[in-house]
């Protein structure tokens, strides 16, 4: 999420030249805005910085020139920042310049927006998961982050899974694999009645956490959006602006089987099949919705009575069995 807009003390915001460690420029005096984004739907953190440059920021060939020309900025430059807001909340670390946007030039100044991301965002593009993995999913996510990504994370932010899953990386990117594993992960509680895991990054590092445990946490802070300048006593802060994205399409949801569906699994080893039915009405009181379970949102019950989507799958029994050799696998 973006940091709440407020007065802040920008102690430093230094852009380092890619090929010269000792060459850099602090653009804090030209910054007009800084937005730092953490998003549970994103694998990496992002920041947007608006800068106005009068053209006398850095010396090159004996004369003062603009930042874009003087460093020069070509992408991938390391950015070291140290910011403290009016509540003494500190935000500091390193990001890397991804791109320059909204570049407007006049005879007197340049204005542009810098988009910067974490180093892990670029590492993900340069690495691939190739090995075969077996065992608990959470342990394999940890291995990928440590051995392939060399990413920063706290062990407690990789939530333990109760299930195991054997797989091969197939030369896919680490972020893709970890996000994909999240859809197959089950926390240690409520086996079979959960919504999977999120894989995301915060300023504390990478996170792999279950949807249910995230939504089941105690309330940390309360925010409100209103037309008054006053803050109601029961709230911690105000929402300055927001966008709501919600649509209702009953027909499409019925086609997708969002409320009631049935899957038939065929067992080629025993030559038999089993059928499993999902009904949204069975999730009340089990899944966390982010609010009170008493407000579990149902559509008209007549549309949840029978499966609206039928699916089939073949069980891959005997595929990728646990063990390093044939003897262990048998």
Predicted regions and their residues:
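Short intrinsically disordered coil segments
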Residues: 31, 63-72, 129-135, 222-230
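Second-shell loop/turn segments in exported
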Residues: 125-135, 163-169
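Short beta-strand-centered interaction patches in the first periplasmic/extracellular domains
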Residues: 111-114, 118-120, 157-251
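Assembly/oligomerization scaffold segments
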Residues: 1-126
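Acidic, small/polar-enriched beta strand-loop surface segments
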Residues: 5-7, 201-330
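Short beta-strands and strand-coil junctions in structured, solvent-facing domains, enriched
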Residues: 57, 103-104, 122-123, 187-188, ...
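Glycine-rich, acidic and aromatic/proline-enriched surface loops and short helix-turn segments
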Residues: 103, 110-111, 117-121, 134-155
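Substrate-binding/catalytic groove segments of enzymes
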Residues: 27, 31, 152-154, 189-190
């Amino acid at each position: 999420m973006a940091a709440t807009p407020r007065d802040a003390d920008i102690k430093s915001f230094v852009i380092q030249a890619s090929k010269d460690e000792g060459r850099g420029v602090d653009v804090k005096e030209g910054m007009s805005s800084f937005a730092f984004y953490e998003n549970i739907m994103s694998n990496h953190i992002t920041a947007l910085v608006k800068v106005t440059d009068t053209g006398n920021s850095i010396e090159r060939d004996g004369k003062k020139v603009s930042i874009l020309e003087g460093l020069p900025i070509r992408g991938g430059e390391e950015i070291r920042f140290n910011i403290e807001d009016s509540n003494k909340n500190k935000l500091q670390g390193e990001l890397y310049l991804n791109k320059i946007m909204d570049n407007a030039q006049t005879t007197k100044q340049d204005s542009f927006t810098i988009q910067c991301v974490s180093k892990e965002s670029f590492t993900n593009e340069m690495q691939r998961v190739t090995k075969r993995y077996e065992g608990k999913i959470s342990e394999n996510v940890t291995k990928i982050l440590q051995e392939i990504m060399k990413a920063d994370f706290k062990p407690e932010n990789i939530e333990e899974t109760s299930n195991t899953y054997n797989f091969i990386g197939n030369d896919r990117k680490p972020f893709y694999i970890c996000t994909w594993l999240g859809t197959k992960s089950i926390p240690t509680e409520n086996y079979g009645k959960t919504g999977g895991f999120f894989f995301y990054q915060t300023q504390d590092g990478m996170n792999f956490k279950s949807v249910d445990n995230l939504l089941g946490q105690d309330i940390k802070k309360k925010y409100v959006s209103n037309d008054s300048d006053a803050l109601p006593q029961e709230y911690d802060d105000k929402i300055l602006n927001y966008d709501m994205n919600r649509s209702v399409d009953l027909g499409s949801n019925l086609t997708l089987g969002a409320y009631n569906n049935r899957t038939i699994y065929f067992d080629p080893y025993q030559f038999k099949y089993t059928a499993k039915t999902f009904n949204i009405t069975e999730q009340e009181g089990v899944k966390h919705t982010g609010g009170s379970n008493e407000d579990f949102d149902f559509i008209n019950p007549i549309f949840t009575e029978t499966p609206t989507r039928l699916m089939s799958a073949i069980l891959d029994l005997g595929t990728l069995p646990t063990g390093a050799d044939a003897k262990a696998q048998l």
